[in-house]
C-alpha cells in the first residue's frame, strides 16, 4: 500500500466494493417484488429499467445502475492505489463500473435503438470485467516480494471465477434468448460469479487497509 494513501481512505474505497454487489442484488430483488407482473424467472434484470414498461418504477433500477457503477469505479481506484502492479486490473474494473453506470443512461427499452445501445454496453462491460479477472489471476498466482502468500488464494479464486464467467457467457447465449422460460434465472446465475468476485476482492482490499 502506498505510504501516501492512508488506511482510512483505502478502507473507504474497499467498502465501496463490498457494498456494490450487495446493494445491486438487494435492489433488483426488491424492485422485482414491487413491480406488478414482473418475473425473476423469465425476465432480465434490465427489463426493470424500461420506463415504457414500468413507468416511474424503472427509475429505481436505473438509479441502481448509477449507484452501483459509481461504487465499482471508486473500488477500482482504491485497488489501483492499494495494490502495486494492479493497473490493468483496476483500469478494466473501472471501465466495467463506467459501463454499469451507462446501463442506466441507456435503459433496455423494447424499441431497437436504446436496446441495441444497452446490449452493446453490456458486452463491453462483460469483456472488460473478463480482462480484469484474467489479470487478477496473473497478478496473484505467485507470491510477490513483500506481500507474503496471502494473495495467492485470490489468484486461484480469480482463475475459478474466470472459468465460471466463460461458461456462464456460453450458457447465457444458449439458454438466455428472448422467449426462454428461464431467461431471467439464467441471467442471474450467469452474473453471480462476477458479483462474488468483486465482493471477495473488496474484502481482500479491506483486510489490507487494516494492516
Regions found by a protein language model. Give the residues of each.
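Internal transmembrane alpha-helix with an interfacial aromatic "cap," most often the third helix
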Residues: 66-91, 133-144, 202, 208
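Terminal transmembrane helical module of multi-pass membrane proteins
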Residues: 138-211
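Membrane-interface loop-to-helix entry segments
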Residues: 59-67, 115-131, 185-193
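N-terminal signal-anchor transmembrane alpha helix
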Residues: 8-34
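Interfacial helix-start motif at the membrane-water boundary
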Residues: 48-70
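Interfacial segments of alpha-helical transmembrane regions
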Residues: 9-19, 83-94, 148-160
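C-terminal ends of transmembrane alpha-helices
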Residues: 26-27, 33-36, 40, 98-112, ...
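Membrane-proximal helix-loop-helix units in multi-pass membrane proteins
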Residues: 99-146
Amino acid at each position: 500500500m502506498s505510504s501516501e494513501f492512508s488506511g482510512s481512505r483505502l478502507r473507504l474505497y474497499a467498502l465501496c466494493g463490498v457494498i456494490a454487489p450487495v446493494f445491486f442484488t438487494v435492489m433488483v430483488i426488491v424492485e422485482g417484488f414491487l413491480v406488478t407482473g414482473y418475473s425473476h424467472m423469465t425476465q432480465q434484470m434490465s427489463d426493470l429499467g424500461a420506463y415504457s414498461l414500468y413507468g416511474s418504477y424503472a427509475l429505481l433500477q436505473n438509479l441502481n445502475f448509477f449507484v452501483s457503477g459509481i461504487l465499482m469505479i471508486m473500488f477500482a481506484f482504491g485497488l489501483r492505489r492499494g495494490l502495486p502492479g494492479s493497473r490493468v486490473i483496476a483500469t478494466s474494473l473501472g471501465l466495467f463500473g463506467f459501463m454499469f453506470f451507462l446501463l442506466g443512461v441507456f435503459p433496455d427499452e423494447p424499441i431497437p435503438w436504446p436496446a441495441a445501445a444497452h446490449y452493446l454496453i453490456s458486452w463491453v462491460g462483460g469483456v472488460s470485467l473478463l480482462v480484469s479477472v484474467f489479470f487478477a489471476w496473473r497478478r496473484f498466482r505467485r507470491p510477490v516480494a513483500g506481500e507474503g502468500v496471502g494473495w495467492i488464494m485470490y489468484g486461484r479464486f480469480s482463475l475459478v471465477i474466470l472459468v465460471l464467467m466463460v461458461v456462464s457467457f456460453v450458457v447465457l447465449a444458449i439458454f438466455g434468448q428472448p422467449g426462454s422460460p428461464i431467461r431471467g434465472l439464467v441471467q442471474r446465475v450467469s452474473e453471480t460469479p462476477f458479483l462474488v468476485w468483486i465482493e471477495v476482492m473488496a474484502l481482500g482490499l479491506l483486510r489490507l487497509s487494516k494492516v
